[in-house]
Amino acid sequence: MSMTNYPLLERVNDPADLRRLPRAELKTLAHELRAFVLESVSKTGGHLSSNLGTVELTVALHAVFDTPRDRLVWDVGHQTYPHKILTGRRDRMPSLRQLGGLSGFPQRAESEYDTFGTAHSSTSISAALGMALAAKQRGDERRCVAIIGDGAMTAGMAFEALNNAGVADANLLVILNDNDMSISPPVGALNRYLAQLMSGQFYAKARDMGKSVLKNAPPLLELAKRLEQQAKGMVVPATLFEKFGFNYIGPIDGHDLDSLIPTLENIRGLKGPQFLHVVTKKGQGYKLAEADPVAYHGPGKFDPRVGLVKPATPPKQTFTQVFGQWLCDMADKDKRLVGITPAMREGSGMVEFHQRFPDRYYDVGIAEQHAVTFAAGMACEGVKPVVAIYSTFLQRAYDQLIHDVALQNLPVVFALDRAGLVGADGATHAGAYDIAFVRCIPHMSMACPADERECRQLLTTAYEQDHPVAVRYPRGAGVGVAPLPDLEGLPFGKGEVRRTGQRIAILAFGTLLYPALQAAQALDATVVNMRWAKPLDTQLLLQVAAEHDALVTVEEGCIMGGAGSAVAEALAAAGLQRPLLQLGLPDVFIEHGDPAKLLALQGLDAAGMQRSITERFGALPGAQALAAA
């Protein structure tokens, strides 16, 4: 991008450059930075609303703290584009979230300024506390700062960390980036003054001295505490953070550098755990994003002068939409159904369900552990819970899945969105492990629909069971196989032969069925749509194995412990020896990029499957014909 419109930003190649700027120029820098973020994201796609809301806070943090010596830990991390731009990665922004380019989240391997990798929520306070106490152990006076959003504060892990931090006496600053409220201008001026006063050395010393003097006069001390709280209560709600041992400061306007910088400077000189409450607005500075921050949360490419527009040709139906429609249809049919999501209403396709069945919709916040056990409790009382959750986020509730659901054999349906590779969000959001970690749990079953129609059908099958079942499906559009309007399921635990060929049989789990069919056409191979990773259709498997010289399993999940491993176990248990090639995701974390390109790099497109099969089984009888196919 041309830097002609960003003369001040062009001079900032790292935070040291920023700290050399006159304070009077920082507002101009913030203005240019916001415009640069908007231009950049409009060309690449990515997270927008959250990044527009953290511009001034990012500028203030790098202006006040000695980064990277002082540690900044950004919770979730999708709001770190301004941070990346100010820390030497401005010129790489055109590569954002592309194969080989910048990550959309902080990555330690990408920059020394990314002190901790984040993407899942509510981890920042724990990480920053660990850094702060490690520094204290070494006698290092560095500051450690956790920046966490109000949504992430709903997770239990954040409060576990606060509880630990309050008694650890570490030089930790927790900044609550609250973008779910606003401060009116009249309150803002008074609030700015009180925030600076309460964050100052004088206030801290006076408060401690007063407590010392009054320690033998409990009634007076209690009165002083009440007066202190009432003084703060003029402009802030009652807060529990001081109960955790933090010095609470705020709320202050997170877009006002004249308030942010002096407050942070005062806090920098304080010892012990500090809690700063800043109020920001998602989409700040771009009217369209301010008006609809959800729509502009993670847009694709767009013209910022026009905003988001609907495509002229309707896109293919996504698996998420298939789930959302099924949920509404099944709710119409069965009044016992309830839908549960851990703060992913839009992402999981539950908007219509929420609108139509508000009394049966439960958004429990970013609290995956609670969501799973909450569903278990409902199932105990005869309710039929459906938990809509991203595959990667179910990892956070693994103990609850085993202990609270499976151990009690409760009929909970888990709709696992974003199974497999997710493209631009990268390794942190990939659903690579669900087959492996679900199929090893007693009582649990795992369905792997191949297309939109099967997704709806297998959701129905899962719902009809009297034990827990997970249904995994990928992000994005399907293959164009329209779902049937009825609510008929498919046979539980049964697959089907989709193509009959010679010598080699490809056992496909999930949406890789379709590239497998393409590869089989060239190889004249049999293709089996397995549908279920657990229970495995052992009868069909052994029949196919007996009729073929070699077997190939394909899955968009980890090879280790995955569906291919289940096939190998079944063959071994039956005492049947057949050459077996397992194709899937290798034992590495796969980074961000275009999903089709990522699959091709792992050999999971049709050409890659054909190549791997030919290379592996070239020594079998008829290999010449196979190699020439």
UniProtKB/Swiss-Prot annotation:
Q: Where are the transmembrane segments?
A: none
Question: Which free-text remark accompanies the cofactor?
Answer: Binds 1 Mg(2+) ion per subunit. Binds 1 thiamine pyrophosphate per subunit.
For thiamine diphosphate, which residues are the binding ones? Answer: H78, A119, H120, S121, G151, A152, N179, Y286, E368
Keywords, ordered alphabetically: Isoprene biosynthesis, Magnesium, Metal-binding, Thiamine biosynthesis, Thiamine pyrophosphate, Transferase
Q: Which residues form a coiled coil?
A: none
| This protein's pathway | Metabolic intermediate biosynthesis; 1-deoxy-D-xylulose 5-phosphate biosynthesis; 1-deoxy-D-xylulose 5-phosphate from D-glyceraldehyde 3-phosphate and pyruvate: step 1/1
Q: Any idea of its EC number?
A: 2.2.1.7
Signal peptide segment: none
Q: Which InterPro entries match?
A: Dxylulose-5-P_synthase, THDP-binding, Transketo_C/PFOR_II, Transketolase-like_Pyr-bd, Transketolase_BS, Transketolase_C, Transketolase_CS
Q: Which reaction does it catalyse?
A: D-glyceraldehyde 3-phosphate + pyruvate + H(+) = 1-deoxy-D-xylulose 5-phosphate + CO2
How is this protein annotated for GO cellular component? cytosol
The alphabetized list of GO BP terms reads: 1-deoxy-D-xylulose 5-phosphate biosynthetic process; isopentenyl diphosphate biosynthetic process, methylerythritol 4-phosphate pathway; terpenoid biosynthetic process; thiamine biosynthetic process
The Swiss-Prot or TrEMBL record annotates one GO molecular function as:
magnesium ion binding
| Ligand binding (Mg(2+)) | D150, N179
Job of this protein: Catalyzes the acyloin condensation reaction between C atoms 2 and 3 of pyruvate and glyceraldehyde 3-phosphate to yield 1-deoxy-D-xylulose-5-phosphate (DXP).
Q: Which family does it belong to?
A: Belongs to the transketolase family. DXPS subfamily.
Q: How does it assemble?
A: Homodimer.
Q: Would you tell me the protein name for this molecule?
A: 1-deoxy-D-xylulose-5-phosphate synthase
Which species is this UniProt entry from?
Answer: Acidovorax sp. (strain JS42)
List the gene name. Answer: dxs
